């Protein structure tokens, strides 16, 4: 479904820089630029693509659109109150940096916060993520990436409402949705994937990238790094003719 009525952006206050000024390195306004710089060096957010958002109680901090990720600073960060977003056609910001635009990823980040109570959501344009979606195009099941019996799977939780992490022998499943011309139009399909696969912490976007979330910045970052590792392993396995799903029996 194409976006026909763009969301109206409103700023409540003209002087709200106090929301992004902090000496604490763990403050969201400091963490987001640091994360984006790290992701840029990994090749995940090339050419201003991708983004990150952190929720701290009711405040949501968002990376802007169009800023080189390795050059991002705290003053570039948008801030909104998640409880003030009552009209889907209007997004109210507590802080909007001058001469910048909000990220088109914003409604997808908000879906992770409202539907999964996430503390952080990351969007990358990782080449490995894109390659996985391309490999799946010619597979019998094109809408699900599945892999098991790889140690790094242990980095993922069992599900939003479950305790503990997946084990070595468990199968990690990441749904795939089709890309759309406009990023915000992905929102309804991301939400559908969340509803259909409630245990997932990520959604792949065909020929585009991946969205990954977690209950904290640490968890989201850990899962994003682990997922990229697994995507790369899976691409190399495909080259060698090795299956992503294998029947490895547990050692007694």
Swiss-Prot record:
MF terms (GO), sorted A to Z: methylthioribulose 1-phosphate dehydratase activity; zinc ion binding
Name of the protein this chain belongs to: Methylthioribulose-1-phosphate dehydratase
Note describing how the cofactor binds: Binds 1 zinc ion per subunit.
Catalytic activity, as annotated: 5-(methylsulfanyl)-D-ribulose 1-phosphate = 5-methylsulfanyl-2,3-dioxopentyl phosphate + H2O
Record key words, sorted: Amino-acid biosynthesis, Cytoplasm, Lyase, Metal-binding, Methionine biosynthesis, Zinc
Sequence positions that bind Zn(2+): 123, 125, 208
Listed GO CC annotations: cytoplasm
Cofactor(s) listed in the protein's UniProt record: Zn(2+)
Listed SUPFAM superfamilies: AraD/HMP-PK domain-like
PANTHER family: METHYLTHIORIBULOSE-1-PHOSPHATE DEHYDRATASE
UniProt binding sites for substrate: 105
Function: Catalyzes the dehydration of methylthioribulose-1-phosphate (MTRu-1-P) into 2,3-diketo-5-methylthiopentyl-1-phosphate (DK-MTP-1-P).
A GO BP annotation: L-methionine salvage from methylthioadenosine
Top-tier EC class: lyase
